[in-house]
Amino acid sequence: MLCFIGNTSLVTALGNECDTIHAIENNQSGLYYSEKYNAVVGEIPARAFDNITSKVNFTKFESLIIQNIKNVLPTENDIDDDTLLVISTTKGNVHLLENNTAVIDNNCFLYTSAIKIADYLKFKRKPIVISNACISGVSAFVVAKNLMSSDDTIKNVVVVGCDILSEFIVEGFRSFKSLSNKPCKPYDANRDGLSLGEACGAVLLTKDINLASKPLIALKGGAVTNDANHISGPSRTGDGLYYAMKEALNDAEVLGADVKYVNMHGTATLYNDEMESKAIQWSCLSNVPVNSFKGYIGHTLGASGVVETILCIYQMRNNIVFATKGFEKRGTPCKLNVSDANRLYTDVNICLKTASGFGGCNAAIVLVKNPVNAYNNAEKPNASIGGEDNIKVLAQYSLPNSSECFSDFIRKEYKQLNLSYMKFYKMSDLSKALFIASENIIRQCPEIVNANPRRVAIIMSNKVSSLEADIQHQQIVDKHLEEGASPAIFVYTLPNVAVGEVCIKNKIKGDNTFFIENFNTGLSEYYAKQLLRLNKADFVICGWCDKEIASEMPMDESQINANSDLEKMNGINKDNNWNVNLKILSK
């Protein structure tokens, strides 16, 4: 079964899809110094998107997604129930917290926005939301392909990625001292940091060759891995990304020697670009053309994987590899075939696209032009897909209920485990809750301890994402302190970092995907089973890790003070009302 690329649409700091491609072809950048952010950024020009917010109360984030989805839908008629919407984002409408952390706007909840969008466009299926740091967009393609491969009822998937600039994001990256004061220079000897951008991109994936754009390009392989090394820095060896690349190629049944082009994350930070060069060397791809788009449009976070894949698709269809803007002289320890000029080739028919992010996550996908047997894409019965397939529940665990405040309760739970792991005390509450639950369930399952770490996956979901850490970070940002924001807090403003902590402690290096939904529908367990059925894991830890919401309605100061001992604030009940339920599945 092949997943073909259908219509595509994007908007970046350079404009819409046509404008963006034309600018890149002509070596033009959309990055500029912004007085608002006191940083070099790439903002979407107002002319580049339809402002429908005034009509139906959509935010800029939601408007961009709606516009780009409309552009890729094959028909204006009703969307069939065989079409799924997958949204990737890191922070969604987090800008709504600015100077407003005493009230929690419902649109701060990622799935609330997703439902608004899906209902407005009349999708019949409930959307899927992925928040996996900077690999979110590439991860969304991996999830979409896996679901299309294992679920006969899904014929089409609209994959859309979007993130917009905000003080929240800019000050967070500034706290890590990772922003350049000039347009970024990926892979260059003089690179000194990244440039942030905003964007939205959408792609129609389809099993129907009649809906595929020509020449045909198929999403043939994909994989997600974890470094199990550090929550805010990449593996210094490049092994985590290498294994994502290797597994994506294996999934696509493509040899590394056949890859014609690699589009890397290429953020222009010292460690990221260094790590990527090592992963390229591990993969024996040092002579294959490589590029990064960050010098044109900036790092667009959860949108980057989708937007950059669309640019890869254009290059494949036109047999060109665009220049890496800002690159002059290679400054990576291992060889990379990077150029400051556009390069034409006879046939760019196989592309490997990668991404890496906080929490140690890595992802890669493989695109193939004019794949063999493209016109014989009938779905074949596969006994491994249907039924329960002897999938077993090896262990279950739920974090106990307690009337104690969470900080006291979780410390006692930690001490009962007789651990000596000082990192625990620096974690966010979300990370602590998942960490303790994971330690308990793994102790029930000795098989997982001795398993191949690359064959162990963690699939999680929740509603609030990382809202507590978001509020803490935003409150610091709102004060405009001379010392700036705290990197120790900002790093936890991504829900998948909680999974990353578990991966680091237990050396788990397989798939690590984090879904967002309004309540526990069993999505994480459903997807875990698909990974097992597709033979992409031997063991999967899956479940729900969330904090119950005391109120999603605005709360004034008197209401906050009235909550017991100030334990309820910002719309979130700070008592021990965590809901953490885990399972370990295996075949």
Model-derived features with residue positions:
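A short, small-residue-rich loop immediately preceding and capping a beta-strand
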Residues: 130, 155-161, 540-544
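Short, thiol/selenol-centered motifs that function as redox-active sites or metal-ligating centers
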Residues: 134
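Short conserved active-site loop signatures built around small residues
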Residues: 137
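Phosphate-binding/catalytic loop of phosphoryl-transfer enzymes
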Residues: 147, 151-156, 161, 535-536
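Active-site alpha-helical elements of protease catalytic centers
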Residues: 140-141, 204
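Short beta-loop-alpha junction of Rossmann-like oxidoreductase domains
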Residues: 169
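Conserved "HGTGT" condensation-loop signature of ketosynthase/thiolase-family condensing enzymes
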Residues: 1-127, 146, 166, 175-195, ...
